[in-house]
């Protein structure tokens, strides 16, 4: 039954996720965001002039013009100059936060139609030397890898991988369990591509050469995937953060570039226009957790979202949990009591990659397309967030 304040996601599209320093390395986050935005707008069948606001998530500003964020996405996508834009940063939850912010704007009558999404150009994270006030006597400052520095939570003194290992150890998650789950992610993603499932949510990115000239080629699929992955190969990988660790390059999410976008409006407005929305927002939840076990964030966030939706896990048909690390996912699965057969059925971030600011939107898009494909009703999307947070969203398929 239609209720006042019901929010619809009318359409969704995302770019393929490009491997680190691969085919998308020279694209800014805003450029990728615009590609996804154009795809979502076209699929919605709405004139770009009708949008009242643009909200895009971005975690790490990597290009020189990154501070213009959502504003440049909107302008590049053909949104009128008069339409304002907002860039949000809830780290790994930024892409989902953009949908929440869009919904809140609509519910408070600040907007009728909002373009929301997330974007990240991780390959463009620069090396930096800190020393704006100059150097005296000693040689120049230390060169930092801004991407690696960002993965260290200085409040708790732990890298993201270490927080996943701690949370995993608390829940009895072994290295073997992590590698087996990582293999599942690769196999599920490979099967999804072979059966043409993931392609439905993608819009190609036209490629260009080092001179900025179009090559005539496009990136049409997620190329971080490793379909030939074996359990033997995963077992041989060394821990990435300490010899006694369990997180490896094979059982952690991939560093990639990409963007995703959705068109959000009130459900009533969408139905009056004769549109066929992908889904309805039933509720969302955001929670804080201990930073040293930041991967636990989806547990309280999912409970809040389910409570707001008036549902229990028993009613959820499909679930998307961001695979920041296999250890983190498995610990969340254990705490929430998730049925793995319902979760990440087309693979997850271990196979596809995790472009920080875009992932939250990607989770929701993937979830809605798969619910429609299977003719199922309810879905839950959730992600952990560096610094000790979690975000979750419950959706209902409208198809």
Regions found by a protein language model. Give the residues of each.
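Conserved catalytic cysteine-centered active-site region
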Residues: 58-113, 154-160, 228-254, 335-362, ...
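Flexible glycine-/small-residue-enriched beta->alpha junction loops
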Residues: 113-166, 170
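Condensing-enzyme catalytic core mediating Claisen C-C bond formation in acyl metabolism
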Residues: 1-27, 229-296, 300, 365-366, ...
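Active-site pocket-lining segment
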Residues: 162-165, 201, 211, 282-351
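Short, well-ordered amphipathic alpha-helical segments that serve as non-catalytic structural scaffolds
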Residues: 30-45, 69-73, 98, 160-167, ...
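Conserved beta-ketoacyl condensing-enzyme motif
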Residues: 25-114, 118-137, 202-219, 292-293, ...
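Active-site-proximal alpha-helical scaffold in enzymes
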Residues: 89-120, 168-197, 261-268, 333, ...
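N-terminal extracellular/periplasmic Venus flytrap/periplasmic-binding protein-like
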Residues: 13-15, 26-35, 43, 177-267, ...
